[in-house]
Amino acid sequence: MKLFFAGLVATAAAVSAVAVPAQAASVASVQAAPVDPVKALKAQLVPGRGVKITESSGIILDFTADDRAMQIRVNTRTVGTLAFGKGNAAAADLRVRMSSPQKGSNPPYRVIAEGRNAYVTNAGIAKALPSGRSWIQSKASGHRNAVPDIVTPAELKFMLDNASEVATGEYQGTATLADFQHDRSAGEGSVEFRLYFDEHNLLTHTVVDTTTYPDDDTMAYDQMVFHTDTKYSGWGTKVKIAAPAASKVISEKKLNAKTLKAAIKAGYPESGPF
């Protein structure tokens, strides 16, 4: 995969027009060659380093009720930092705001995610909790990780293999939902994506639109569309994210109904932090 090919051709032409020693020309050529995007991403995924993200995402659910076409929209904006483990995202410190045309904007909240645990707070949530506690801890179900997904090297390779370069450093592609998720049971659907790279072939921007359809007439929706627009910056930044002090945390399971209701009203996400 060669990105920025036109720029490299121009560089080579300029070098060849000047008389330089063969060894020097060879060194210049090696230095100019861009790193493969997948290798560039892999090189960043090391403990102690991270990346800053700004993400806008949305879900549009179309369904029919009493022979009337209905639609639900939920939008989420996420800003913060991901910390890497060995080959993946191991922790996150993010500010999240959710909104919908039906309910308006919910109070924003902060979430720290580490492994299967997520810790959520904001001023209203802290006020609703027992004295001395300011964070609610929840645990991801099954073997899921509470940390938000980042594009993995394998996913990046798949997308590049199924994309075409439409401009310098910009790729566009499509795939079936089953192929994109490497899961034949994923159901009917399609995925459209755009990838943007900087001069070092590091991702700066991804846009992914996924459309899914019900498997049969018994499903409660007609169509579901997921849109995710993620911008990356500060690759390789030194990052250290730690869970809140245990003395400040209370498990969601230990909240009584009244306290949980107050926390949700203050912005605690009852369906999960992401």
Regions found by a protein language model. Give the residues of each.
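Secretory targeting and sorting signals
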Residues: M1-A28
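Subset-of-secretome marker
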Residues: L3, Q23-F274
